[in-house]
UniProtKB/Swiss-Prot annotation:
The keyword Zinc applies. GO terms for biological process: regulation of transcription by RNA polymerase II. Keywords: DNA-binding, Isopeptide bond, Metal-binding, Nucleus, Repeat, Transcription, Transcription regulation, Ubl conjugation, Zinc, Zinc-finger. There is a cross-link at residues 176, 198, 251, 266, 308 (Glycyl lysine isopeptide (Lys-Gly) (interchain with G-Cter in SUMO2)). The gene is ZNF552. This is Zinc finger protein 552. May be involved in transcriptional regulation. PROSITE patterns: KRAB, ZINC_FINGER_C2H2_1, ZINC_FINGER_C2H2_2. GO terms for cellular component: nucleus. One of its GO terms (molecular function) is zinc ion binding.
Length: 407
């Protein structure tokens, strides 16, 4: 079996005819059903690729095929390859027509004319398969994730949505049968003149916008198949618990962690220092103080940090970025926490109040230092003379005395 060689023009635009393989009647009769199916798939995918690249071979000034312009209509009786098919109805142009006409002959494979039952693949939306190929196709999904990549999305022949009356391969209103597996049919629009969402080809191929929205999160998707895949990842159950602040969660452990914000409950205890936390994640981060773990490294100076947000703030030292600017005085800051404290200079706000004497402070660290006046706590001890101090600044000042003596 010899196929005609591909012809590539030296100059000019490549047309669909240039990349298509043509068969004579004798050669076509020698092809098996599997070979004809393969020929059909390859030809349709080539057509999709040519159209997506703008290499459409239609009439001059004619736009590339849109989601309402490409369809293949097939009469009930079997035609011979390369037979004359009306170019106005059966194919986009006279050059593609004879080639696409060959594809119509695949319609009689595996008992299509016997109106055998077709099956829908749940993972691939409305794509239809006969009984034998359906089971073979289902095996392809075993051990793989159902999401399909963008390259596959671009294959027009694999993504056209069909509207079928029942599960028969014959469209009941016209009495004409269609090549369901080709993926290039428009049935309902042919009879009603209207375009149904189920007959629209994927908007990604045609450069359209996302028309399918998720009712749960309002995200938009280019195809209904992708939307279906997204919806499978959403929680299938209603939120089991609601908080007084309006937040909800379908997971009880997440809700319990959130509740700790309101109840001040701290059920997680550090086994080393006894400090309490309202969530397990906060406890794990705290334990890095005891273990010395610093998993976040600066690529510029190789410094390590316990928290990711500390690394992000540190990197602004290298970039010079100061994203937080005071609208009152024009000062800018690298840290949001420093900026918040600075704003209190202008507002006079002092939210931290001492319960012993009623004195207020703008920073929590200032209140902590002040409390030591009442408690008598002196946590900073000198390693040379064992003197203790309430503030670390006082300790550093004292240590200079020992350095001078050592000189």
């Amino acid at each position: 079996m010899a196929a005609a060689a591909l012809r590539f023009p030296v100059q000019g635009t490549v047309t669909f005819e240039d990349v298509a393989v043509k068969f004579t009647q004798e050669e076509w009769n020698l092809l098996s059903e599997a070979q004809r199916c393969l020929y059909r798939d390859v030809t349709l995918e080539n057509l999709a690729l040519m159209s997506s690249l703008g290499c459409w071979c239609g009439v001059e000034d004619e736009a590339a095929p849109s989601k309402q312009s490409i369809y293949i209509q097939r009469e009930t009786q079997v035609r011979t390859p390369m037979a004359g098919v009306s170019p106005k109805k059966a194919h986009p142009c006279e050059m593609c027509g004879p080639i696409l006409g060959d594809i119509l002959h695949v319609a009689d494979h595996q008992g299509t004319h016997h109106k055998q039952k077709l099956h829908r693949c749940e993972a691939w939306g409305n794509k239809l398969y006969d009984s034998g190929n359906f089971h073979q196709h289902q095996n392809e999904h075993i051990g793989e994730k159902p999401y399909r990549g963008s390259v596959e999305e671009a294959l027009f022949a694999k993504r056209c949505k069909l509207h079928v009356s029942g599960e028969s391969s014959v469209f009941s209103e016209s009495g004409k049968d269609f090549l369901l597996r080709s993926g290039l049919l428009q049935q309902e629009a042919t009879h009603t003149g209207k375009s149904n969402s189920k007959t629209e080809c994927v908007s990604l191929f045609h450069g359209g916008k996302s028309h399918y929205s998720c009712g749960g999160c309002m995200k938009h998707f280019s195809t209904k198949d992708i939307l279906s895949q997204h919806e499978r990842l959403l929680p299938t159950e209603e939120p089991s618990v609601w908080c007084e602040c309006g937040k909800s969660s379908s997971k009880y452990d997440s809700f319990s962690n959130h509740q700790g914000v309101h109840t001040r409950e701290k059920p997680y205890t550090c086994g080393i220092c006894g400090k309490l936390f309202n969530s397990k994640s906060h406890l794990l981060v705290h334990q890095r103080i005891h273990t010395g773990e610093k998993p976040y490294e600066c690529e510029v100076c190789q410094k390590f940090f316990r928290h990711k947000y500390h690394l992000i703030a540190h990197q602004r030292v290298h970039t010079g970025e100061r994203p937080y600017e005071c609208s009152d005085c024009g000062k800018s800051f690298t840290h949001s926490s420093t900026f918040r404290v600075h704003k209190r200079v202008h507002t006079g706000q002092k939210p931290y109040e001492c319960s012993e004497c009623g004195k207020s402070f703008a920073e929590s660290s200032s209140l902590t230092k002040h409390r030591r006046v009442h408690t008598g706590e002196k946590p900073y001890g000198c390693s040379e003379c064992e003197k203790k101090f309430r503030q670390i600044s006082s300790l550093r000042h004292h240590q200079r005395v020992h350095k001078r003596k050592g000189l």
